[in-house]
Amino acid sequence: MAKIEDCPGFETFGADVKAARKAKQLSRSALADMIHCDSRYLANIENEDTLPSLPVVIQLIKICGLPVERYFNPELMREESAERQRVSHKL
């Protein structure tokens, strides 16, 4: 299994999933059922930096409404952030 530190862009994936799950008022068990996995596995993803398989990542991104670019194209997100900072300074 890949390690989080070996996958740029996924450093916050677990925390993002947890925050989105709570924002949608889903229990960990309910979300685990939706992605057909054990709630302990989901807890490991959320809390212990476990990087799930690609199919599970895709399901979590869809269900939680997470921006796919953040994880699969982190450079784009950094560029957009830098551009937003430049624009906001001009406003």
What are these regions (language model features)?
Residues 1-23:
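A short, Lys/Arg-rich alpha-helix, primarily the initiator
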Residues 17, 31-32, 42-45, 71:
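Conserved hydrophobic/aromatic packing and binding residues within compact polymer-binding modules
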Residues 15-30, 34, 59, 84-91:
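Short basic helix-loop element that most often maps to the first helix and adjoining turn
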Residues 55-70:
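DNA major-groove recognition helix of helix-turn-helix/homeodomain DNA-binding modules
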Residues 2-3, 7, 69-91:
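Short, charged recognition helix plus adjacent turn
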Residues 35-51:
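Recognition helix of helix-turn-helix/homeodomain-like DNA-binding domains
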Residues 15, 39, 54-58:
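Short alpha-helical elements of helix-turn-helix
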